[in-house]
Amino acid sequence: MKINGVKGMNDVLPADVARWHEMESVAREVFALYGYREVRTPAVEHAALFARGVGEATDIVNKEMYVFEDKGEELLALRPEGTAGTVRAFIEHGAFVEGPQKWFYMGPMFRRERPQKGRYRQFHQIGCEAFGVAEPYLDAEQIALLADYFARLGVTAELKLNSVGDAQCRPAYLADLKAYLVANQGALCADCKDRIERNPLRVLDCKVESCQPVLEQAPQLLERLCEPCRTHFDQVKAGLDALGVAYRVEPRLVRGLDYYVRTAYEFTSDALGSQSAVAGGGRYDRLVETLGGPPTPGIGFALGEERLSMILEKVGRAMPERRPAVFFVSADATGALEALRLAAGLRRAGIACELDPRGGKLKAQFKQAERVGARWAVVLGGNEVATGQAKLKDLQTREETPVALSELAARVSG
């Protein structure tokens, strides 16, 4: 009986992995320019970390998190996002004593959502977290980092920007928003009605068409920011203007996690259709303290690799992919053994090569050489081994020339 993969757990096959290598290598290059260093945290954490950090009222914790008891009866969870685990590591290892820190991560996350295009139950994120600086110009710098990253990949993405206030101005706004939503709940979808009590801010993020007339008339937090939050937001915008980063203020932009304060932002792409968000982040100045650390401001973002890969494929960006320089075509057993020896020498010299240990018809071997994208084919048999000379075929020009086996590396390394 055939066993298929688990629903929503997607395979990334070799033909697609080149895009993933490109996304990740460019991320490492760009992040290093801004002083971010890589951290690797486990995929399994205590479930309480996300209940306290992400928020018990969020859909992630309530509906989507994979939770299980291990043999020691501890309640554990597969991480649904990367920030809480990174903050936990920052606290646990005392990194706060070293002053401001800039970290980034890459890896799989897990949410039991309904699988759809660009959204899987195991998905991969690249994220940055900066700790220890509350000033708004850090917000602008981190957003510029993400804009630089997309530009390096050749991706066009629109930046949407908002402020979600803080503990000084948000409670009064939430009370007004909740009252408005309750008064108009008859025109809202079932999910929105459920969120009114648990997480009214998330109602503003609803994409259901029938809800839009109500949401368009909803109170806006931007109009009710306290003076410190207003000043912070103005300075973030000034920083982005100074850096030449274009943005659009989006008053209904909220993030789905409870820990965000003040700056919230999102990059979207038309290439994804309705699932347009490719990256998002914001400020979380009380999260470190909430998870048991000293008061430490922070800001971070995460981008979805699956969605970004879909964009790169759609825009037709050429991906660098290392193909073998040489394919050895064996005419007989003597040639196959010599091919094995020569291939080892070329690889030690840093030259990629392949051979087919099965041998077989020369025509089939040449077809395989072209299928794997080799530049050169070297034909070897007993006569070639005896004379130390072989036929070297350029698979692009179709030209054949003799080559001394002792000079093969020099001929194919150019």
Swiss-Prot record:
GO terms for molecular function: ATP binding; histidine-tRNA ligase activity. It catalyses: tRNA(His) + L-histidine + ATP = L-histidyl-tRNA(His) + AMP + diphosphate + H(+). It is found in: Cytoplasm. GO terms for biological process: histidyl-tRNA aminoacylation. Keywords: Aminoacyl-tRNA synthetase, ATP-binding, Cytoplasm, Ligase, Nucleotide-binding, Protein biosynthesis. GO terms for cellular component: cytoplasm. Its main location: cytoplasm. Its EC number is 6.1.1.21. Homodimer. Belongs to the class-II aminoacyl-tRNA synthetase family. This is Histidine--tRNA ligase. It comes from Anaeromyxobacter sp. (strain K).
